[in-house]
Amino acid sequence: MSVYDKHQALSRLTLGKPTPYHDRYDAALLQPVPRSLNRDPLGIYPDSLPFHGADIWTLYELSWLNNRGVPQVAVGEMHLNAESLNLIESKSFKLYLNSFNQTTFDSWESVRATLANDLAHCAQGDVSVTLFKLSELEGQPLAGFTGECIDDQDIQIDNYNFNADYLATNEQDAPVVEETLVSHLLKSNCLITHQPDWGSVQIHYRGKRINREALLRYIVSFRHHNEFHEQCVERIFNDLMHYYQPEKLSVYARYTRRGGLDINPWRSNTPFNAPNGRLPRQ
């Protein structure tokens, strides 16, 4: 259980509550969650962030009406800067997108600009939005994380409660390496509803070699942990910095789709390119 899952900032959210669906545009449906909820306990403060990054959202269920009443459909891609004061709560995002369904817009650009403006206002940060016609995405192959997968280790695991101290199992004389490690065994739970969130995580670093067994046990220990996607990625980044102090560190997670949305947060203390390629489970 998170130390802040009963915080008053979460009590007003529609998440986990019966909610009517609106099909007329309503920006007020968007609900923010302060990033400080998980950052403050980790000692992460906005004036000295240890990383830069973004939350990359893919919007699969986006539709509106053109001036002649003909429905339009698109796939959207939204990048929310990690320096924003708030993250966007995903159920409210879904309800907000539903409100476009029977709303008339003059152009695709009007839709894009409306999305960008509303999301930036809710998050109190920088947002970019791109809309794709379906024909632009047809035939795109599934992507994969580059790096060495650590999932097939011959170990036994019998504890699935979150424990960052697994990472304390490091070698004092470990050599300095630069490598990319990947796991597809990241599973956490929604902070409010406790529904499972399934993800893959890529960790690129330069520093003392990370103990791969310890890292896998640490990742698996998220299975009973309740936090939003973005918060889990920041926790992983923070814990790796605490135990290993790498010179360079990038953490990128891609989660499976729910409600027509997938969320793919990344955090890094070095220049980092986060390709938005759909993984097999997405």
UniProtKB/Swiss-Prot annotation:
The keyword Aminoacyl-tRNA synthetase does not apply. NADPH binds at S90, K91, R258, G259. It catalyses: 7-aminomethyl-7-carbaguanine + 2 NADP(+) = 7-cyano-7-deazaguanine + 2 NADPH + 3 H(+). GO terms for biological process: queuosine biosynthetic process; tRNA modification. Transmembrane segments: none annotated. Gene3D superfamilies: 3.30.1130.10. GO terms for molecular function: preQ1 synthase activity. Homodimer. This is NADPH-dependent 7-cyano-7-deazaguanine reductase. It comes from Pectobacterium atrosepticum (strain SCRI 1043 / ATCC BAA-672) (Erwinia carotovora subsp. atroseptica).
